[in-house]
């Protein structure tokens, strides 16, 4: 090809296009003379382009080289303004003490390599210098042009290498004539190479030839998603492939060791990203990391590193499209910048292998359900506290607060308000310390923890003196309720403890939820109590009588009738069995709400059999038309009733009757008016009838068991109402619950409907209403007020 005319090799261009695209030469890198450490070339031929890689891992014989000049340079092939398109560029002289080189850019032309060189980076005043080139007026650039000089200030040449018109990390560093010779060959990894190039671009990477010619090549197809970083040190070259693609993350490349070389730079590879030093002051200034990464691929995390210098790295990502161009002219006219080719720079911190860059964070195992008490270090402290706790029945004045209801939690909110108004319950929970999640990540008592937290949501108010209690209504109106809150930790107990109340489609019942709370608290306290006495067998039974064996029955029969604490039970084959009263395990919950009823069964020609049953709520049947008041329901409870259809083993029908009496009265008596009647068909109907209930309730002696009538005084069987839970609606489904509570600090009553709190008079509490019916009645013993 002639070199004296204004000829170009990649298509036909008009003079305007020539002046626009190819008028400015570019700075290039000069390599040392070929008679010392020079490059070895590998040419790869494909259908649409030729590819030549170069390195410095062999010494080229003088007679076999195609390079005839001692000073030469190889320039880029991608940038349309690069000087390889102009065939008449004069080579520049090499500076002897030059240590940094800009780029390795080469072209392949028929039959020999065209060696072009511009001025060095230091020669800013020359026509080929980058400084002069940057100061020129910006002209209209072709669509595919990549601006790689935007970050360079005036008069200063870039220090990074430029490959295909873009900043690249594979520049030559510290190559001089004083470099040592290689004692061994470093095999070049024949992986296609790609740089940060625009779409529809073709990459030509050449190497200096070795031995006969540049005809020895590896047939490797260029892939847009598989970049290869080529690096040259004083006496070696590393070609490290780093594979990136749309569907695969960066892979870790292995640097092959070499022997007999003396390098002054540290090299590192981490996940296909090559760390290279930028000059002699690498330890001081750091190392730059350049990689081509697809924007759609996952972010690669460094796993290995070889350099010992901590560095700040920059990662550039782009998504080149692998579409071969028909000609360079069509490439310049038709290529359009893609929106996916934007370069993003991410500042990352590189650390040496002594300290791992990825420290796996230890995940704390969070258990949804309660843990055993043996795994809870706080359990023993709570157990000791509950063992020595003394119930406080002193009335407490609390600032009222509503409860936010974002679901169907009205039956829970109504029950919670009644329990907060119960002084012994409030004082009990306030005596237990409240632990944070950091202090107690796993708990064996979720029910206790939740109610301790609930009671701490309410603050005390000063109790007005008796002189002002006469003006109770005025005092109440001067008190403002606190802010409403949502007790989500209480709602969560239904799923944590896996109660049947959490089953989908189950009837939401305030009385059933109250039993769920009280039984749950009792069981947790029983477990804590067992922690203090692990060898006590009685604690393994929550509540219930112990049945004696037949031998014990015979011994008891020989001793006589027995004491008042004994009870009889009909065992198998209708044989009478005598059993002592069970030793019930007491907890603070049973000390507040727990009572006992005595159920006696009468049968002809047989001894009476009695059973003691504990209760938290006393169930009152109000279905009969004769029952109009709570007193009527209590008398109906203890009335003797006959049991029909009972037959013996001889198929003879026997008349049996049963009677229930109150054996023990609790400090807090909860009466359940059974308004829901379940039919044989499976349906449920609500009994809409008014049941009168007094503020002060006296349990008559006729309701008590014969053995305790003389032991319980009048003050111990007289109760005062302090809370009422109402059920709204005429059906069992789609119901709503509200609560009226007595506030001692206000000396009056409050009506709480979820988050709404208002003051009412006492007659409104006991007055019958068509829109609501009393469902649960909370009474306190007057001797404990």
Curated annotation (Swiss-Prot):
Active site: residue positions: 410 (nucleophile), 736 (proton acceptor)
Keyword list, A-Z: Autophagy, Cytoplasm, DNA damage, DNA repair, Hydrolase, Nucleus, Protease, Thiol protease, Ubl conjugation pathway
Lineage, broadest ranks: Eukaryota, Metazoa, Chordata, Craniata, Vertebrata
GO molecular function ontology, one term from the record: p53 binding
Species this protein is from: Gallus gallus
Compositional bias of kind Polar residues: 113-122, 262-277
Protein name as catalogued: Ubiquitin carboxyl-terminal hydrolase 10
Gene3D superfamilies assigned: Cysteine proteinases
Feature: compositional bias, Basic and acidic residues: 290-304
């Amino acid at each position: 090809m002639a070199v004296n005319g204004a000829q170009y090799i990649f298509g036909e261009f008009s003079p305007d296009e020539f002046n626009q695209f190819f008028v400015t030469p570019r700075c290039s890198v000069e390599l040392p003379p070929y008679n010392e450490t020079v490059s070895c070339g590998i040419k790869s031929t494909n259908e649409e382009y030729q590819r030549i890689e170069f390195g410095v891992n062999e010494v080229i014989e003088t007679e076999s080289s195609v390079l005839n000049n001692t000073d030469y340079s190889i320039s880029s092939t991608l940038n349309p303004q690069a000087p390889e398109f102009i065939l008449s560029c004069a080579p520049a002289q090499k500076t002897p003490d030059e240590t940094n080189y800009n780029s390795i850019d080469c072209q392949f032309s028929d039959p020999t390599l065209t060696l072009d060189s511009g001025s060095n980076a230091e020669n800013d005043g020359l026509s080929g210098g980058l400084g002069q080139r940057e100061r020129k007026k910006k002209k209209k650039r072709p669509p595919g042009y990549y601006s790689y000089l935007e970050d360079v200030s005036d008069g200063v040449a870039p220090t990074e290498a430029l490959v295909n018109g873009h900043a690249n990390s594979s520049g030559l560093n510290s190559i001089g004539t004083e470099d040592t010779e290689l004692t061994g060959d470093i095999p070049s990894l024949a992986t296609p190479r790609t740089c940060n190039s625009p779409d529809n671009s073709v990459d030509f990477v050449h190497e200096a030839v070795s031995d006969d010619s540049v005809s020895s090549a590896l047939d490797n197809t260029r892939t847009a998603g598989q970049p290869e970083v080529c690096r040259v040190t004083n006496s070696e070259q590393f070609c490290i492939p780093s594979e990136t693609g749309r569907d695969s993350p960066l892979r870790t490349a292995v640097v092959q060791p070499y022997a007999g070389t003396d390098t002054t730079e540290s090299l590192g590879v981490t996940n296909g990203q090559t760390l290279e030093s930028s000059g002699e002051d690498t330890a001081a200034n750091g190392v730059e990391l350049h990689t081509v990464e697809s924007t759609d691929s996952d972010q690669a995390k460094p796993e290995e590193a070889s350099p010992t210098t901590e560095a700040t790295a920059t990662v550039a990502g782009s998504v080149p499209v692998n579409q071969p161009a028909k000609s360079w002219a069509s490439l310049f006219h038709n290529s359009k910048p893609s929106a996916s080719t934007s370069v993003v720079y991410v500042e990352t911190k590189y650390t040496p292998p002594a300290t791992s860059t990825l420290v796996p964070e230890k995940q704390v195992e969070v258990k949804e359900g309660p843990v055993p008490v043996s795994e809870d270090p706080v359990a023993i402290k709570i157990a000791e506290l509950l063992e020595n706790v003394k119930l406080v029945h002193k009335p407490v004045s609390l600032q009222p607060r509503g409860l936010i209801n974002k679901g169907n939690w009205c039956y829970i909110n109504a029950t919670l308000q009644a329990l907060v108004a119960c002084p012994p319950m409030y004082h009990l929970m306030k005596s237990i310390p409240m632990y944070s999640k950091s202090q107690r990540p796993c708990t064996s008592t979720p029910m206790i923890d939740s109610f301790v937290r609930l009671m701490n949501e309410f603050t005390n108010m000063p109790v007005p003196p008796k002189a002002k209690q006469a003006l109770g209504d005025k005092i109440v109106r001067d008190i403002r309720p606190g802010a409403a809150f949502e007790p989500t930790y209480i709602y969560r107990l239904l799923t944590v403890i896996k109660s049947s109340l959490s089953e989908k489609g189950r009837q939401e019942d305030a009385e059933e939820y109250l039993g769920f709370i009280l039984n749950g608290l009792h069981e947790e306290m029983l477990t804590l109590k067992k922690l203090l006495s692990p060898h006590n067998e009685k604690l393994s039974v929550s509540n219930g009588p112990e049945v004696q064996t037949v031998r014990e029955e015979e011994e008891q029969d020989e001793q006589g009738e027995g004491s008042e604490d004994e009870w009889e039970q009909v065992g198998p084959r209708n044989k009478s069995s005598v059993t002592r009263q069970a030793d019930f395990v007491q907890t603070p919950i049973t000390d507040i709400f727990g009572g006992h009823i005595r159920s006696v069964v009468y049968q002809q020609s047989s001894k009476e059999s009695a059973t003691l049953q504990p209760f938290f709520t006393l169930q009152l049947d109000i279905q009969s038309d004769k029952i109009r008041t709570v007193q009527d329901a209590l008398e109906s409870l203890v009335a003797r009733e006959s049991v029909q259809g009972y037959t013996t083993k001889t198929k003879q029908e026997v008349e049996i009757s049963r009677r229930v009496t109150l054996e023990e009265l609790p400090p807090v008596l909860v009466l359940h008016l059974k308004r829901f009647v379940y039919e044989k068909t499976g349906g449920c109907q609500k009994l809409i009838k008014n049941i009168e209930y007094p503020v002060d309730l006296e349990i008559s002696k006729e309701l008590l068991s014969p053995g305790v009538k003389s032991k319980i005084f009048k003050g111990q069987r007289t109760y005062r109402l302090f809370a009422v839970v109402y059920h709204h609606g005429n059906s069992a489904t789609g119901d709503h619950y509200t609560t009226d509570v007595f506030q001692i600090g206000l000396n009056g009553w409050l009506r709480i409907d979820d988050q709404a709190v208002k003051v009412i008079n006492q007659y409104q509490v006991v007055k019958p209403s068509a829109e609501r019916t009393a469902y649960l009645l909370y009474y306190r013993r007057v001797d404990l007020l």
